[in-house]
A protein has these predicted regions:
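N-terminal small/glycine-rich loop or linker at the start of catalytic domains
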Residues: 8-20, 54-74, 107, 111-115, ...
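Glycine-rich, positively charged N-terminal anion/phosphate-binding segment
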Residues: 2-9, 24-99
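Alpha/beta enzyme core
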Residues: 38, 87-117, 125-202, 218, ...
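Alpha/beta catalytic cores of nucleotide-metabolism and tRNA/nucleoside-modifying enzymes
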Residues: 1-11, 15, 19, 25, ...
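Hydrophobic faces of well-ordered beta-strands that scaffold small-molecule active sites
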Residues: 19-23, 44-46, 74-78, 101, ...
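Active-site beta-loop-alpha junctions enriched in small/polar residues
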Residues: 24, 49-51, 79-81, 106-108, ...
Length: 327
């Protein structure tokens, strides 16, 4: 059996393969999660949500927890730094249908870390452990943690944080091989992910710079991780899960055609209309469209046309018109 043709278990939840869609703000909306599942993601993660927003009934935050019956298993990621609030939010997320609760200890964005949340928790390991413990005690579903290798290069805290998370009851850990200070610059450090794998007995999910079959193979081979989590490599590219699966299984890798890309772009757009309404769908689809069309002939001019559309029908006509020219 190769690295891909096997189920993976996180606590009580088993997924059919070790391929996971990372939680990404502005990317992992419900329609895209459904598309990723269809193209081979064994576990999808919703966009991170504020624990305080959930607990205090923020309408927009709760709307982000809308779940479709066909996307399970689903992980919902929470960010926050107050154990009691995180525990209460986890209960809400479970009630909304989360199969796994993920705790964000990796977000590098300033407005998150300035509140001591996200990757700032890596600078306060006792508090991080308390957050995990509180969430584990509050819910009956598995709890996972997503982290980075540390705040900066001055201290490699991930192994110790991983041990503390395991002691607090975490079922698995996802490790992005960069520090907070790196954001997304440089390369993911696979040696540091491997060190976390050796530090704990629970599954470790490798994350960072997986963009195709060979890079996924390197992640498995050089880290010994149990599963992989694909983030930016999946932006506008749900086919990456099929590509990775085929590559690691020794099958011929089939790249999506331009027609395939336009068809899924429209599928995503129609899903956003149903999920969020026409106005929001038009606005949000501009970012998605730039990812779907990246590298295609005439994509820069197409993006300009897309950005000028003001109605659903205009958007459909622009994409449909370009798609016809690819046939």
């Amino acid at each position: 059996m190769n690295a891909i043709d096997r189920p993976v278990r996180f606590g009580s939840v088993e997924i059919e393969s070790p391929l996971i869609l990372a939680p990404m703000a502005g990317v992992c909306d419900l329609p895209y999660r459904m598309i990723a599942r269809k193209h081979g993601a064994a576990l999808v993660c919703a966009e991170m949500v504020s624990a305080k927003g959930l607990v205090y009934g923020n309408k927009h935050t709760r709307e982000m927890l809308t779940v479709h019956k066909n996307e399970h298993p689903l992980s919902m990621q929470l960010f926050g730094a107050e154990p009691e609030i995180m525990a209460r939010a986890a209960k809400v997320a479970q009630e909304y249908g989360a199969d796994i609760i993920d705790i964000n200890m990796g977000c590098p964005v300033r407005k998150v870390v300035q509140n001591g949340e996200g990757s700032a928790l890596m600078k306060n390991l006792p508090l991080a452990e308390k957050v995990v413990s509180a969430v584990v005690k509050a819910v009956s579903v598995p709890v996972t943690v997503k982290m980075r290798t540390g705040w900066d290069d001055s201290e490699f805290v991930a192994p110790e944080l991983a041990r503390r998370c395991e002691a607090a009851g975490a079922a698995a850990l996802a490790v992005h091989g960069r520090t907070r200070e790196q954001f997304y610059s440089g390369r993911a450090d696979l040696e540091k992910i491997a060190a976390v794998v050796k530090a704990v007995s629970i599954p470790v999910i490798g994350n960072g710079d997986i963009t195709d079959g060979p890079s996924c193979a390197r992640m498995f081979e050089e880290t010994g991780c149990t599963a992989v989590m694909i983030g930016r490599g999946a932006q506008g590219n749900p086919w990456i899960f099929e590509e990775v699966r085929d590559y690691l299984s020794g099958r011929t890798v089939q790249k999506p055609s331009a027609a395939d890309r336009y068809a899924v772009l429209l599928e995503h757009f129609e899903g956003l209309i149903r999920f969020k309404g026409a106005h929001i769908a038009l606005r949000e689809m501009r970012s998605h469209a730039s990812w779907y069309t990246k590298g295609l002939f005439g994509s820069a001019a197409l993006r300009e046309r897309i950005n000028r559309t003001s109605t659903v029908e205009e958007f459909r006509q622009v994409i449909s018109g370009v798609a016809k020219c690819t046939v």
